[in-house]
């Protein structure tokens, strides 16, 4: 068997990826997420750890460098900057030739960054070959396809329609020596099949092939995934190689989160760092609190918040500055978000009745709020800024084994076990700032918790909510946390025991819902407006 200890794999990741819909404006094709990993990571994990990767980058190439360097530090990687990648006189073959210095002198495999495959290549490194996969005649014109006799290549057809199914060239090739490179160079080739002529070349069928060449294909291939993310504009999430990675189109989002994590590292994941537009940190063991919910766990989370999360702010911040920051964050931001809603729906009027409850308009409720009161007597701490139970990781250690008849064990017994074990919490996905400051108002975190009890963000992410609107009536449905009244009572007692104002916590909940609305797509945006009206009525219409 050929020696694969230092197989060189060339990944072509320099192109624009103009057909990738909303991703085209954010990241290069290599970083398009699929199942919470970018395509390039799916490719790299197909190969042995000792593989040497040469990655050709061009459009948004620094993003690829930043991501791969931060997440795949354990791999042998060489980046090659491709010049003039945007000009019409370039192509995949041009890119391969530009990488000649790093791939000449031995066999190498090359593939496009939008191609995922399952194929055992290790016993096929003693000859030249290309990978093909059958496609229907209706899409034959979208691919280079081959005519062959078994494994023998007869002809490569350049993106022409066929009356029958064809074997499409999947953008995957192994060249056992420099002959293929020499062919490309002699012909000044732009397209990769130009180098096949005169080459002793076999054709191998790829058992499973996924083509992510367009946004429509990405949607189709992603439709079966069950791990649903809840994306915001200009933001992406990855879970890759024991790292959690967040991307924003503006670098400040990663930079500010690192600064805030430095204020309270004990409550945060390990190794929080910035890599350009990416925030990277270690994967936190455990599960989100939503999946491990019991009253003792809720009590322990409040205890963790008091001891580790809500650390006192520096004493050099004046009360006047705190009030100004809160006014900016609570009042000014809310007015800006309402204006965003008006711009988005210029002819829409909010419902007058929500779930059978008569409600006022958003403007009327905002006029009823005593903003000065809301912004006075703050509780200035280090705050998470988005402290619901999807953004907190919980890990529990106990020495008591689960009995075989656990399904019939009294819940009180398990509650007692939970009290004796070790409870670990880790904050994830924290805010960049609070009104431009590193510290903020603890009331906001408490309101986030209360809002997450009333409406389970976990279920919302799974689209287990509904919004129906007819005339001035709206009906909204979304599961709350089971036994929500008991949890709310625990939170209320904790707030009062710590000398805080429960009404202020309750008032901030609909303000938070309202602020979330314009950041999301329909119908969730209107759902949030109606939800805020429903909760405003409970607090202000009394």
Where in the sequence are the language-model features?
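Conserved kinase catalytic-core helix
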Residues: 263-268, 289-385, 497
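Conserved core of the sugar-phosphate nucleotidyltransferase
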Residues: 116-191
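ATP-binding glycine-rich loop module of kinase domains
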Residues: 230-259, 277, 282-283, 288-293
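N-terminal glycine-rich phosphate-binding loop and ensuing alpha1 helix
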Residues: 2-64
